[in-house]
């Protein structure tokens, strides 16, 4: 359990309804300072509502929430001085350059980061003088992140940070997020990419129908929920063995194959993933 002094976010029995529809039905979790925390769930689960409450953009109906020791419902302006937000879609001026955009946002903060340092951190040094409208989709997301970081935030909210990225750009973004974590920045991540959450998050919470149905480290969730699968082909048929003891099962299979003179064709040992766990918890997601 994380000690109280080490918590960047504390949420207890948080509720929010829109008319007769309950978006959040008493969720509780804590985020430690300096960790990457992932909030996962299908569309309509309540993720956006929860994040907007924590950012100070939406009022809760009940329960308690503190972010960096502040109540986001009563101290939103003070809170926004200390957090950075990367929205899924942003509206930055297309006619400003990358450098001008960073300098403009730096002017909103009392103690901003050095603009050139931020531009280098997000990998846009060569695009410093390029206009926003000329940037690729991945470069615009890097600009969004730079704008979120220029105020020296203690906590950064990342909403679908790599949507639309090609594989190389996604990996580069992951390394950037890891570098932020190494600097002590707390990161609150929402993503539909389960491999991204597994790679980056120290802990995750799975939200469904306004309730948190599971939370913990990705390794803990995987260990609690899934077994390892061993697949091979024998006599033209695919055989799948599910086991909690893969070493023992594989040894028995190979010994049997050696004794009978059979080959374990197309042998594959498939470890469970966070995506497997997620789909078991919430089912197939539909858009």
Predicted regions and their residues:
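ABC transporter nucleotide-binding domains
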Residues: 6-11, 16-189, 194-208, 214
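Charged, amphipathic alpha-helical segments
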Residues: 213-221
